[in-house]
Amino acid sequence: MDQWIAQGLHGNMDYLERNRDKRYDPSILVPGAQTVVVCLLHFDKSGRDYHRTVKSLLFRLEARLKEEFGEDIVSPTHQHIFCDSAPMLERRWCVEAGLGFIGKNHQLIHPTLGSMVHPGEIVINSPVSIANRQSPIAQLCADCQLCLEACPTGALRNEVWDATQCVAYTTHHCLECQLVCPYNEAKG
């Protein structure tokens, strides 16, 4: 990410230049943090604000965690539930949790849900040992080039996404690279 920013490929997303330390170390963002619990929610066609939907689910999960492990499982003084709202490397945490891989379209792709997902996180103050933790999923795009070929501006080039060339960066409405992705077939 640092190299991508240094090359100016992030365009005017200046917020990506700030708080880099927090992006790489959640304990700076949430003092006492030891674990990032991640979840994915498939795109909702209803038009509801996904931030609210994901956070609502995470607040319910937080209540269950507090019931099971006590109030100290989360920070009482710092925001610890996030959905596209804090300097978090959301895709990185999802990959590490085994929830998907980063595809050639530079999106997180879950093998079943596809890339039309919204991640959310709860940062907790306890280490978590998961007996059946999934290993990170290998990049499964193989020889597929559909997203690269579908990109109307050439913003997707092999290992690089150039935000300054991406239509979604300027309009928020281009999904061409996702619409052609085989992992999104029949998922709408």
Residue spans of the language-model regions?
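Iron-sulfur cluster-binding cysteine motifs and their immediate structural context
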Residues: 146-168, 172-188
